[in-house]
């Protein structure tokens, strides 16, 4: 009864699981769910923010129509929101990858008694749980800021969303500790590779990387594979440098002595995994969608990749993999992509299929009738049922009617 990989014989003898860490499977499942929830909460926040930014108009009136500019048309709003939109798609396909990886492991462990995929599964789920939950927590707050003062109202939905999501960075394992779980695996794979073992497919970049970016060598800035090469090089450099400074230290000592360096390397690896899966999903989708849809998806893939480079540019400039001129070109290309994605922004958040009940936001409802919803909600608020606030008649009115305000002693 309730026996999985361990069992108890009729004579009472306990037979342990063939792999002592097989119990990690349950933790892995929860962490893969957290990656899925990261995508869901990021979709929720960016849907609310983009819909409100489409409705809200402020400053710079059009001379022809007299209408003020939609907030979504400001470059800063686009630079904040559209990369989050792209990242939500990236996290969605990465969560699918994690779940497929988990269920494949479950099938092999039960039917074939094959636990060989467990170390990679544990390391990947640990790192992605940390990477995705950090990014989503920050994205929710970034989305709230693009909505101005209204973003801080309870009616906006950001406050409750952030409050319910923020604990993800610490439960089921503190994120920094989980990054070190990924780092330990990277160190072990690297050391085994030096003895002639072939690393898993997703860690193939450890076998070596070019000293110069294919982007810098003339590849198009919209070549998704060239972008992935840049991510692979960054991960390769940071992991190999961390391995070299760790020398002959045991994994435990290496994580303790070079903790910051290893956490940075683990984040770079996770960024590569997300980018890898986003491109893979894009390629798999290619035969099934129209040319117009494919074009939009390609823009999202490129935007996610280029913004990831731009936001951590120092890590690419550090070893001159990308030079200053190329960094400037990447930034210019990002601004072009923002303009191209702008006409499809509403359709892209609609594609998430999140209903108004789940969004629970006056700012993000699908009908876009923001101000009527705000007015109706305020009218229904208990504090607005009476003309005076609670306590006025009991405390303030007697003093006001007597004129008894007191006299200053100064």
PLM segments and residue spans:
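Flavin-dependent oxidoreductase catalytic core characteristic
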Residues: 1-410
């Amino acid at each position: 009864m309730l026996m999985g990989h361990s069992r108890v014989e009729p004579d009472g003898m306990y037979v342990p699981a063939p792999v002592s860490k097989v119990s990690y499977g349950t933790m892995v499942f929860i962490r893969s769910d957290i990656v899925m929830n990261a995508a869901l909460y990021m979709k929720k926040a960016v849907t609310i923010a983009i819909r409100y930014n489409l409705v809200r108009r402020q400053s710079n009136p059009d001379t022809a129509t007299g209408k003020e500019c939609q907030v979504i048309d400001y470059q800063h709003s686009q630079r904040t929101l559209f990369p989050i939109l792209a990242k939500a798609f990236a996290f969605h396909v990465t969560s699918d990858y994690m779940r497929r990886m988990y269920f494949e492991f479950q099938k092999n462990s039960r039917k074939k008694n094959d636990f060989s995929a467990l170390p990679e599964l544990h390391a990947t789920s640990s790192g992605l749980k940390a990477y995705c939950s950090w990014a989503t927590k920050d994205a929710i707050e970034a989305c709230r800021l693009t909505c101005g003062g209204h973003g801080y109202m309870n009616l906006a939905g950001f406050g409750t969303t952030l409050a319910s999501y923020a604990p993800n960075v610490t439960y089921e394992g503190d994120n920094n500790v989980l990054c070190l779980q990924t780092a330990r695996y990277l160190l072990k794979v690297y050391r085994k590779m030096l003895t002639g073992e072939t690393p898993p497919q997703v860690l193939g970049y450890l076998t070596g990387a070019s000293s110069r970016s294919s982007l810098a060598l003339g590849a198009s800035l919209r070549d998704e594979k060239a972008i992935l090469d840049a991510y692979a090089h960054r991960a390769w450099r940071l992991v190999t440098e961390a391995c070299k400074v760790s020398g002959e230290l045991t994994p435990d000592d290496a994580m303790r002595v070079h903790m910051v360096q290893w956490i940075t390397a683990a984040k770079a690896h996770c960024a590569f995994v997300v980018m890898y899966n986003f491109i893979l999903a894009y390629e798999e989708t290619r035969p099934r969608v129209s040319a117009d849809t494919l074009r939009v998806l390609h823009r999202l893939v490129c935007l996610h990749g280029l913004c990831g480079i731009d936001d951590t540019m120092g890590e690419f400039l550090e070893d001159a993999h990308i030079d200053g001129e190329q960094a400037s070109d990447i930034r210019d290309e990002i601004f072009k992509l923002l303009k191209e994605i702008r006409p499809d922004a509403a359709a892209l958040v609609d594609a998430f299929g999140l209903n108004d009940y789940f969004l629970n936001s006056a700012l993000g409802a699908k009908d876009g009738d923001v101000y009527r919803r705000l007015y109706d909600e305020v009218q229904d608020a208990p504090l607005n049922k009476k003309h005076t606030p609670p306590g006025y008649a009991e405390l303030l009115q007697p003093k006001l009617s007597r004129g008894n305000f007191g006299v200053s002693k100064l």
